[in-house]
Amino acid sequence: MAIRALEGDLIENMKRVIFDVKGLVHPPNRIIAYPRFIPDSSGNRKRKKASYWKVYSLTERFKFLQRDLPHYVVHDPIFDTTLCEVPVEDVIKHYKPVEKLQRLRSSKSLSTLENRALQLAELLREKANLPWNALGISGSILARLSAASSDIDPIIYGSQNCLKAHAALENLLKHKRGPLRPYTQDDLKILFEFRSKDTAMNFEDFVRTESRKVMQGKFNGTDYFMRFVKSWNETSEKYGDVRYGNLGYARIRATVADDSEAIFTPCKYKVEKVTVVEGPRPAVSEIVSFRGRFCEQARANETVVAQGKVERVRDSKKNHEHFRILLGNKPSDYMVLA
């Protein structure tokens, strides 16, 4: 079975574990994805007769994998790091956000959360003038495992659609009587308690970046977290075209030269005037992350301090090499305004 898995999709294996897909580049016959919903008779998420636990932190996800699915944990030679790679032959279901939204639109019996997700999608489509196939709903709604406290996880596909949706969100958040609200200080405290479990950062630095993000907030009282993902025809990289080499760990101070890819997952910040505070010293030209929490983290001309893995990036097709900082799975990985 051939599966074209995209950031924000979910896949389910033969043991009924549900994984969230990361990125757009995957090895042959395997999908880079991490466990999100784990079957457990004592779980607090219900779907028909099955119970699940939702796993949040990367530490807990890897603990589960090492215990129950150790053969999924591999050192990938192309990415030069340890990843969870799900064999395609183990996948029994592929959940697609666009198809989920289509089903919500045609359904006659939606939950309160599903109805709210549909309303948010309709609002974005109208205000940003988007086609329906550019929008999807991911997360617990996609898996049919939402709880009363669940948030809404919309996804926008295609660069131009993403830029239009982002601009529409900015405008909507300015209307104090509208359905969208930015996070308050109290909301940010709750978010900080959740995020600080696996990303080290003090509250003041956290508020400086998170308070101005438009991809997260409240819609009619329900949290939303939006992802912006490039479409397949914008992604030419195939597995093996580019090789990544781990050169160690570093902390740098740099100026953001280009933030045009800051909203996307994965996000990218071109940097200049780089000073290495600690660690290896190759000429780093960008900061990259596959984690949504690092989107919209800084703007052009701002100075940042970032800490993460230093990687050599070799593109065999373009015969080009450069160096980057990858903000990944370690709690010590961070990027803050200087």
Q: Residue ranges of each PLM-predicted region?
A:
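Catalytic core of pol beta-like nucleotidyltransferases
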Residues: 1-149, 157-338
